[in-house]
């Protein structure tokens, strides 16, 4: 049921039929974009609160923008909590407390489907086909742990293809980071013993592991096998060092320690991860849209959004009570399909000390965040004044392109917000000639693009040959971007910055007029000698101007431009490299998908195929000597 009236009158009209039952309501703006999702024990009472006179500014702004209102009845408060959390995650409403940049935490995965298992970094919600340890707070934590484990236990780190193709030990064996099971330098039984030791260490059974290793060292010494005994001794020392560096807790085994702090209306939630009694790192979060919100509200919304993506430990220990704790616990249990969960607020003892430590870290993180936020706001105000914007910009989109004489052309968009770059909003546009298939992060199939790029004997352009026409590239990128903005008006930028000059200004105006959109934009070009610090700014209706290179706003604009430039070059090189690799094999008559896969499977990588001799190529199933010679000649011809 939808009524097309606005604000408080809309809410009053909905109150007539609103039930006195639990449920979820949604407020929409004129474009049917979700402004707010809320839950209620009693929908009628909750909606009545919105027509009272003592509303805060945030709520007044929300009601003023509300043009449509819908609600759904639920069977229980827990069901309402679940539905609210799911809708917030799906729509990311402007006026809800949002947890952004919440990627799933990485794990260490021990494969169990191979005679010689390997340790891998794994990120994902589904934990299957292996033994998993973690989660860890960051990829860096996982990489560091994997490096230490490889030094100590020397398990293989290579892919199956690489493992199967080896005829001699690789460099990892030479630098004593692998026992080279690929060429039989260690038998299955001894390797399995190492795997068991890794499991014991990662599961926190370090005391038992060190005792077992000590017994083994003494046994080897008594047998006069001193070199092997010395290796075990070094392993014990390394384990002690890693254990000391990581930090071990006797207070908690599997728990998340979560502390929330507030300052000047901004919140920080710091999460410390403990698994098998070992500290697995910590990470701060800064929920948005927290104006006029309480700690209880912010922490409740945080927990519900956080544990939609993260694995839930046996215990969650927090520094502040939440109002609806029992229902929150039930909701998290249902989201993650678990039976047991405790959320506690300790007042004394070891757990209270861990919470206090998390709170101290949260305060430090928030102070650093606020310094960055304040500095960024000052710069944003200067940008507003410089380019005559109506308000301080909240979202700036910067555009650039990269190509070699029109080939392998890509356009990019990077996004900056209140506290810096928003990398999840970055976009890549593979610019193409009208006759070619295109691909971007937003649409298309990369294989179709590649298939369209390589025909004949030469390496053709990936992304189309548009003869180095920067204007056509920009026209395509902006056309696609503005088309998407019609579907996502809530992502409308406050300002667009284009790396270009007067000619680019005309192209932007042309595309804006075509779409009947009026987004503020400016073109930023290098000076006459293309020296940094002498950039020129081109704005419709104004003379070209430059800024003092020492001004903070000038330095900030240069940082924005450089970020877009580097992102464009990175993706251009990636596309070019991928195109060259694919085209070399695709250009060989008689080598289709099956033989190409056979080559890559046998040798393990494209580089290994290139390094292979004719004799080695002919060993691959389906490759005869004549075809091997053709492959060798094509792969070794000059570009």
UniProtKB/Swiss-Prot annotation:
Residues annotated as domain UVR: 207-242
Keyword flag DNA repair: yes
Q: What is its main location?
A: cytoplasm
Gene3D superfamilies annotated for this entry?
A: 5' to 3' exonuclease, C-terminal subdomain, GIY-YIG endonuclease, UVR domain, UvrC, RNAse H endonuclease domain
Biological processes annotated in GO: nucleotide-excision repair; SOS response
Spell out the subcellular localization from the entry. Answer: Cytoplasm
Q: List the disulfide bonds.
A: none
- Database matches in InterPro entries: GIY-YIG_endonuc (IPR000305), GIY-YIG_endonuc_sf (IPR035901), GIY-YIG_UvrC_Cho (IPR047296), RuvA_2-like (IPR010994), UVR_dom (IPR001943), UVR_dom_sf (IPR036876), UvrABC_protein_C (IPR050066), UvrC (IPR004791)
Task: Specify whether Repressor is a keyword of the entry.
Answer: no
Q: Which GO terms describe its cellular component?
A: cytoplasm; excinuclease repair complex
One molecular function GO term is: DNA binding
Q: Which residues form the GIY-YIG domain?
A: 20-97
| Pfam families (UniProt xref) | GIY-YIG, HHH_5, UVR, UvrC_RNaseH, UvrC_RNaseH_dom
State the UniProt keywords alphabetically. Answer: Cytoplasm, DNA damage, DNA excision, DNA repair, Excision nuclease, SOS response
Tell me the PROSITE patterns matching this sequence.
GIY_YIG, UVR, UVRC
Q: What does this protein do?
A: The UvrABC repair system catalyzes the recognition and processing of DNA lesions. UvrC both incises the 5' and 3' sides of the lesion. The N-terminal half is responsible for the 3' incision and the C-terminal half is responsible for the 5' incision.
Output the NCBIfam families linked to this UniProt entry: uvrC (TIGR00194)
What family does the Swiss-Prot or TrEMBL record give for this protein?
Belongs to the UvrC family.
Subunit structure comment from the entry = Interacts with UvrB in an incision complex.
Q: List the protein's name.
A: UvrABC system protein C
Q: Which organism is it from?
A: Rickettsia peacockii (strain Rustic)
């Amino acid at each position: 049921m939808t009524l097309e009236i606005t604000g408080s009158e809309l809410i009053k009209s909905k109150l007539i039929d609103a039930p006195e039952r639990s449920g979820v309501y949604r407020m929409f703006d004129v474009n049917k974009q979700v402004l707010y999702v809320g839950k209620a024990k009693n929908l009628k009472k909750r909606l009545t609160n919105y027509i009272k006179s003592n509303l805060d500014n945030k709520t007044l702004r929300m009601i003023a923008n509300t043009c449509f209102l819908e609600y759904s009845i639920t069977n229980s408060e827990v069901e309402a909590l679940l539905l609210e959390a799911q809708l917030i995650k799906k729509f990311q409403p402007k006026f809800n407390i949002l947890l952004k940049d919440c990627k799933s935490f990485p794990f260490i995965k021990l494969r169990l489907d191979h005679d010689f298992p390997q340790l891998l970094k794994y990120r994902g919600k589904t934990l299957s086909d292996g033994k998993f340890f973690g989660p860890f707070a960051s990829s860096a934590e996982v990489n560091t742990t994997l490096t230490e484990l490889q030094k100590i236990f020397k398990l293989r780190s290579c892919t199956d293809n690489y493992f199967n193709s080896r005829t001699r030990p690789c460099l990892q064996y030479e630098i004593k980071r692998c026992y080279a099971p690929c060429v039989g330098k260690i038998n299955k039984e001894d390797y399995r013993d190492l795997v068991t030791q890794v499991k014991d260490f990662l599961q926190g059974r370090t005391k038992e592991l060190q005792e077992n290793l000590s017994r083994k060292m003494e046994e080897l010494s008594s047998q006069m096998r001193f070199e092997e005994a010395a290796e075990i001794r070094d392993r014990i020392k390394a384990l002690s060092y890693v254990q000391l560096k990581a930090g071990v807790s006797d207070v908690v085994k599997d728990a998340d320690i979560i502390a929330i702090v507030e300052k000047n209306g901004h919140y920080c939630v710091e999460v410390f991860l403990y698994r098998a009694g070992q500290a697995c790192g910590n990470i701060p979060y800064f929920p948005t849209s927290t104006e006029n919100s309480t700690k209880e509200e912010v922490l409740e919304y945080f927990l519900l959004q956080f544990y939609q993506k993260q694995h839930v430990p046996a215990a969650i220990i927090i520094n502040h009570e939440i109002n609806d704790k029992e229902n929150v616990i039930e909701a998290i249990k249902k989201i993650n399909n678990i039976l047991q969960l405790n959320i506690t607020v300790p007042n004394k003892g070891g757990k209270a000390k861990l919470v206090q430590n998390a709170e101290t870290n949260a305060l430090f993180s928030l102070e650093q965040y606020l310094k960055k936020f304040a500095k960024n706001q000052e710069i944003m105000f200067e940008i507003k004044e410089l380019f005559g914007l109506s308000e301080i910009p909240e979202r700036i989109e910067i555009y650039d392109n990269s190509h070699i004489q029109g080939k392998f052309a890509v356009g990019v968009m990077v996004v900056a917000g209140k506290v810096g770059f928003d990398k999840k909003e970055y976009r890549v546009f593979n610019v193409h000639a009208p006759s070619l298939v295109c691909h971007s992060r937003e649409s298309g199939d990369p294989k179709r693009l590649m298939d369209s790029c390589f025909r004949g004997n030469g390496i053709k352009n990936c992304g189309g040959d548009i003869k180095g026409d920067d204007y056509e590239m920009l026209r395509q990128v902006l056309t696609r971007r503005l088309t998407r903005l019609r579907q996502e008006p809530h992502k409308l930028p406050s300002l667009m910055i284009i790396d270009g000059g007067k000619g680019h200004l005309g192209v932007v105006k042309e595309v804006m007029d075509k779409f009947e959109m009026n987004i503020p934009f400016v073109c930023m070009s290098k000076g006459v000698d293309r020296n940094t610090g002498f950039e020129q700014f081109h704005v419709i209706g104004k003379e070209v101007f430059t800024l003092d290179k020492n001004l903070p706003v000038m330095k900030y604009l240069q940082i924005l431009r450089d970020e877009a430039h580097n992102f464009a070059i990175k993706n251009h090189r990636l596309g070019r490299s991928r195109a060259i690799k694919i085209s070399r094999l695709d250009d060989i008559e008689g080598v289709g998908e099956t033989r190409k896969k056979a080559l890559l499977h046998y040798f393990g990588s494209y580089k290994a195929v290139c390094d292979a001799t004719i004799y080695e190529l002919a060993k691959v199933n389906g490759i005869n000597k004549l075809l091997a010679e053709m492959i060798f000649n094509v792969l070794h011809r000059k570009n």
